[in-house]
Swiss-Prot record:
Keywords, ordered alphabetically: Cytoplasm, Ribonucleoprotein, Ribosomal protein, RNA-binding, rRNA-binding
GO biological process, one term: translation
Family statement drawn from the similarity comment of this UniProt entry: Belongs to the universal ribosomal protein uS17 family.
Entry annotated with the keyword Protease: no
PANTHER family, per the entry: 40S RIBOSOMAL PROTEIN S11 FAMILY MEMBER, SMALL RIBOSOMAL SUBUNIT PROTEIN US17
GO molecular function: rRNA binding; structural constituent of ribosome
Signal peptide positions on this chain: none
Name by which UniProt lists this protein: Small ribosomal subunit protein uS17
Primary residence: cytoplasm
Subcellular location per the Swiss-Prot or TrEMBL entry: Cytoplasm
GO cellular component, one term: cytosolic small ribosomal subunit
KW Cytoplasm (keyword) present: yes
Amino acid sequence: MAEQTEKAFLKQPKVFLSSKKSGKGKKPGKGGNRFWKSIGLGFKTPREAIEGTYIDKKCPFTGTVSIRGRIIAGTCHSAKMNRTIIVRRNYLHFVKKYQRYEKRHSNIPAHISPCFRVKEGDHVIIGQCRPLSKTVRFNVVKVIPAGSAAAGKKAFTAA
């Protein structure tokens, strides 16, 4: 069962908990009574979403949110909020008068499911969904750790 930390009883809306049958070997999170889905679009459902015990109604894998619209990649700029991160997207803007480019960036708040572990500097892929709050309209669908992106490139070493 999920950790009950809120005042309201946390449960998944599509799972019936008061079954009269004795569920031998059916533990929540171990293939038992847990709802999860594939969001499609080429993204795999994380193992933590299938086997975990968290309850998150805004999670695209275990909740009632569908991913539709834009798919955007960026870098995690801040992970200080509860289940929400700030994704920074850097881009170049052309200034016609000077025939040059200037650096710009945009910050996008995105909901992150408890099935992901993210730190500042990690690359994330976010998908658009319905408005989850006043400012959040995106959901994290994939996390690429910061070390793995540079693993293919050989670092300079002075021999």
